[in-house]
Amino acid sequence: SARQMSAFRGMAEEFTTLRKLLATNTDIPVANTLKSLLESGNNAALYDLYRFRSALSACRSLGWQIGTCAWNDQLLSETLSRAQTGKRHILQLNSTRDTFSTTGRMLRPVAFSLIHPASLESSEVEDIFRDEGFILAHGRECSLNGSGRNMLSRILHVGHSGLPKAEWGIDHSNHL
C-alpha cells in the first residue's frame, strides 16, 4: 500500500482525510488529488516543520496526548494537571511560531516536557524524532508522585545539527 512508500511516510492523517472526502463527494478528481499528495510527500522531507508535525502525529497515533503550555508561569500547574490523569503527555514548552520560520525552517530547538507513568519508557518519542532526522538533548527530569500515581516529567529538546549552539540554551555537547 502507499503507506509503506517512503514518500508517503507520516501522512496517515492526510490519507484518512482523503478517504472521508472521497466517501462524501465522488465528483473529486482523484488523480489530481493523489498527484498533489505525492508532491507534498516528496517536499515534506525538505522542510523541518513538516517532519516535526509528522513526528508529533506519529506520537499521537501511539497514544501520546499533545498539548502546549501557553505561559511559562503555568508550567507547574499544566504539568501537575496532566500528571494526575496517569496518561502519557507531550507538553510543548515553546511556541511553534517562535521555533520555526514562516517557510518551515527550524530556527531554534523545540522544548517538550514528556509526562508519563514512571513504569513506561518515553524512548519511543525520542526514536520517532530521530527517525525524522532531528537530534535530541535531555534537560531535567523529576518525579511526580501526587494522587497515588508515580509519574515522571522529562524535558526533551528537539532540534537539528545546523542550529547555533547558543540557541539550545543547554549543554549541547551531549546529544542523544
Where do the model's predicted regions map?
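Intrinsic disorder/low-complexity detector
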Residues: S1-T85, G159-L176
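An N-terminal amphipathic alpha-helical segment
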Residues: T68-R108
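Short, conserved helix/loop micro-motifs enriched in His/Cys and acidic residues
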Residues: V30-L38, F100-L114
